[in-house]
Amino acid sequence: MSQNFDPNQNYYSFIDNGTTPIVFIHGVGLDHKMWRHQIESLKDYSTITYDLLGHGKTPYNKEEVSLNDFSNQLVLLLKFLKIDKINLVGFSLGSLIALDFASKFQNKLAKLILLGTTYKRTEKERSQVIDRFNQAKLNKPLSKQALKRWFSDEYLKIHPEVYDLFIEILDKDPKDHINFLKSYKLFANHKDNIDIIKKVKTKTLIMTGSNDLGSTVAMSKSLSSDLINSSFIEVENGKHLCSIECADDVNINLKN
């Protein structure tokens, strides 16, 4: 396993087991550590986790960030690692990045997995996300509110170590908070380009938790109907971070 920085100072971890690598893209405000349950379960596969621009150990100094910036980040990382083909897994903002990547670099993808993605938000849904973004701009702590949306109360009671990990990840110093806001702004104001989405022909699996209030089952079903070569699986009893709370169910589908 290599844990290192590429020439562009992107932090990554690469476990090379000789298979087509599975690349994981985390969500806004998080980092590569959110995928621990998947990496442990997929220990016989080649896997890559990395920190997005302005997240975790990867720096970012520009005033704004775009999906194109994030897609180019991944292209450059793959070029550095000399990898031509991947399976790509994106969560939340990561799924929007994964779709953008797929629309531009389908030749690099074997399969695409979108987890907890948003799609065709209603005006009410959009305003709720923008309200949370505006709270974040005022430096109001969102950590505990976010965890209530992402996990069930019962799970966090049984797994205090998960609670502690995500409080640590979400508790930003001022410079990290500024970069967090850049990505949060992108996520909150995102509008789907349906014409581009309909051109993606990569075999795609879409998953979301049955109790995910922000990235709903209805959104995922709608996306699946617009993606030509896709299927949808509802993760029973899962909230937004069903990849952790319902890791066994998610991992079985990743392996399949």
Regions found by a protein language model. Give the residues of each.
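Conserved alpha/beta-hydrolase catalytic His-Asp/Glu region
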Residues: 123-125, 140-198
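Gly/Ala-rich beta-loop-alpha elbow adjacent to hydrolase catalytic centers
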Residues: 90-94, 98
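Flexible "cap/lid" loop of the alpha/beta hydrolase fold
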Residues: 99-104, 109-140
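Conserved HGGG/HGGXW glycine-rich cap/lid loop of the alpha/beta-hydrolase fold
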Residues: 10, 14-59, 63, 77
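Conserved acidic catalytic loop of the alpha/beta-hydrolase fold
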Residues: 69-86
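Short beta-strand/loop motif that positions the catalytic acidic residue
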Residues: 200, 206-208
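Catalytic histidine-centered segment of alpha/beta-hydrolase-like enzymes
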Residues: 238-251
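Acidic catalytic loop of the alpha/beta-hydrolase fold
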Residues: 210-215
